Each structure stands twice: as structure tokens, then as C-alpha cells.
Amino acid sequence: MSAEIICVGTELLLGDILNGNAQYLAQQLAQLGIPHYHQTVVGDNPDRIKQVIKIAISRANILIFTGGLGPTPDDLTCETIADFFGSPLVESPAIIEDITQKFAQRGRVMTPSNRKQALIPQGADILPNPTGTAPGIIWEPRPNMTIFTFPGVPSEMHRMWEETAVPFLKSQGWGQEIIYSRSLKFWGIGESALAEKVTAYLNLPNPTVAPYAGKGEVRLRVSAKAPSEAAAEALIAPVEKQIKDIAGLDFYGVNNDSLASVVGELLRSSGETLSVAESCTGGLLGQMLTEISGSSDYFWGGVISYDNSVKAGLLGVNSEDLEKLGAVSDTVAEQMAMGVKTRLSTTWGLSITGIAGPDGGTETKPVGLVYIGLAGPGDEVSSFKYNFGTMRVGLRPTVGDRSFIRHLSACTALDLLRRRLLTR
């Protein structure tokens, strides 16, 4: 037994709308312990929807459709499913009454086109929609086959799933075991290098371990199948500990942890403070830090020193060094870090100066060249050189990708501070 998610909507194929429904349903299926191996997105075309159904029923017993339940001519999900299985559509008086009442509550009269939403395959049960006009169905068109349909509006679909589909599936015996996962996060190591280090864990049966790439980072998903979350965590815990020991400082957090949140907790626990000076990242580092609730406990503030006059005037960077070495240099990065630390009276100062591109690079200072400065207690200061323009993420080079170079710069600065706090 397995489930397949089928999301209907040309707007999804065109990329006009992010397909959050598939992500939500995949997570929900895991919580119920229902195997799920395929997802499909298909446009509002009956022939192509039928092709998708033909493939899906050859490999899954539970088909979950989202989208295509509205009143317009291109909303074809229910009628196409019924036609595929050779079932007539019947009008549901209960749905007509529900839609009529909802229109009346809004001071409107139901339009003739909305009657289309009351047509369901003969023998199907209604999935009530508490907020919208598009109900769903639960239907068993043949033995060992269950079909669910939901509207594409996420808020409506979520509520209908939780209030009707989940109880139904549990009544069928699902939910006795769950699939529970923890995402281990790593920075400063590539996916292949990490996979090589943890090769012995990649073929475990339960829990399973699988690497995947995040935005500039690498993650390992450790998943266990067990009767409860606590039982799954007990299976995962020893494997997680062993992987952390192998990865060392390259491991930084789990699940919803971010580099900013981890650094914040380290600063808070030590009673220390941080300030930042940014050039090419233009405030991104400060934004990451202040996205964390309570960051005012340790983050004093920052200076966006985009122009050299600000570097010299507000941070005290030597004008001769700016003229001779340029703003993108180790010396300037160190002076920026020390300058912001001194002026804001913090324990630590972080600085970033570089060439984010896509223009502005030279042969000696190419796009992606970044210097990060770190000033610590007393007169401690150091700088680190990176060339993010030579990196690749999957098949995509970062050179010329201004947004991604800035992201890598800010995250790497946080990672440098994290490692320093852990190893002093």
C-alpha cells in the first residue's frame, strides 16, 4: 500500500504558484506512516490528467488530488476522475445547500456555475469544506483503491485533510506507525565529502540516512519508522550522535536551527555581544541575526558601510589603506571588524567586504572574492579570504549570482564566529 500526490493546475506547471500542498501532504503522510514514492503536477487538461491517473493506479493504492475543484470551465478534476473510472456524475443536494448558505452568508446569490461543484462521482462520500465552496470527495472506485480530492487553496485543503481525511485513514489502520525524521545540518563541507565520511550509515534499514543539499549547506535526513515519535527518536539518537562525532565542527544544528540561531545561543550562554560591519552584503548579516526572537540580548547593531567614506568615517578604516589596498582586502576587513566592535562596545565584531557581482570584478579581484573580518576580546582580530565565485551548487555556478554570493558570505561569517566560540 502506498499513496501518490497529484496536484492539478496549469498555474503550478508555469511556476506562478509555489506547490506548498505537495510538501504539506508529504509531511502528513509521513506522520501517518503511509509510504509515498511519487508526486505529479499536471495541468488543467483532461487527457493528461487521465494519463497521470493511469500511471498512478499502477503503483499506488491511495491517490490524493489537489486543485481543479472550482466552478470555472478549466476546473476538471472530479469529472475527469469519474470519466476515467466509468462512473456517472451525480448532483449532491447537500453540497448545493451548503454552497447556497455560504453565498447567503456573504449577502450573495449562488451563480449557476457553482452548481458544477456539486457534481461528484456516484458512490463517493463528501469531504465537507468548512470555509470554501469547493468540497472534496473520498471515493473507492474499485477494490483496494481510495481517491481523495481537495481544493487547491492551502488553508482549505489543510483543514479538510486534518478534520476528515486523517480520521478516515486512521480508521483504516493507518497511523499505527509513523515515519519521523530529523534533519542534521552542516556548513563548510561538501555533499560528496560528507557522504564519504558517513558511508557506513547510508545503507541502514531503520533509521535510514540520506544526504541532500540545502542553500549553501549540506543536510542529512535521518528517518525512523516506529509506533511513536518517542520510539523513533530512540532509534535516531545513537546514529545522530555518531554522525555528529564524525562530522565535528562541520555539524551545526538540527531541523529549524539556523547558523544565526546557533550563534545567538552561544553568545547568550556566554553573556557576550556582537556587532557587524557590512559592505557587499548590505545588511543581510544583520537581518539574519535579527530574524531570531530575543536577539537583542546579544546583538547590539551594525553599520552598512557600502561607501568607502562610511568605512573611514564611521568605522575608522585607514583612508590610505582604502586607497592603496582597496575596500576588498584583508586589512580593510580587519579594520572594519575592529572598528564596529570598538564603536559599539561589543565582545565580538564581524565584517564582510567583497565583490558580489555580477559586475565589478577584475583579474586580481574577481566576482565572488570576499574577505571576512573577526575581532574578538582585547586586540584579537583576524581575516579570512574566500572566492565564492568559483563554487558550484549542483550544476549551477555561483559566479554572477549576486544574491547567492551575498548569502554565502553572511552565512560563512556566522559560521566563522560559531567555530571560534566553540574552540577557544
Swiss-Prot record:
Q: Which CDD domains match?
A: cinA
Spell out where the chain crosses the membrane: none
Alphabetized InterPro entries for the sequence: CinA, CinA-like_C, CinA_C, CinA_KH, Competence-induced_CinA, MoaB/Mog-like_dom_sf, MoaB/Mog_dom
Gene3D superfamilies hit by this protein: 3.30.70.2860, CinA-like, MoaB/Mog-like domain
Q: Which Pfam families match?
A: CinA, CinA_KH, MoCF_biosynth
What highest taxon heads this organism's lineage?
A: Bacteria
Instruction: State the similarity comment.
Output: Belongs to the CinA family.
NCBIfam families assigned to the protein according to its UniProt record, in alphabetical order: cinA_nterm (TIGR00200), molyb_syn (TIGR00177), PncC_domain (TIGR00199), PRK00549.1 (NF001813)
Identify the PANTHER family for this entry.
NICOTINAMIDE-NUCLEOTIDE AMIDOHYDROLASE PNCC, NMN AMIDOHYDROLASE-LIKE PROTEIN YFAY
According to UniProt, the name of this protein is CinA-like protein
Q: Which organism does this record belong to?
A: Nostoc sp. (strain PCC 7120 / SAG 25.82 / UTEX 2576)
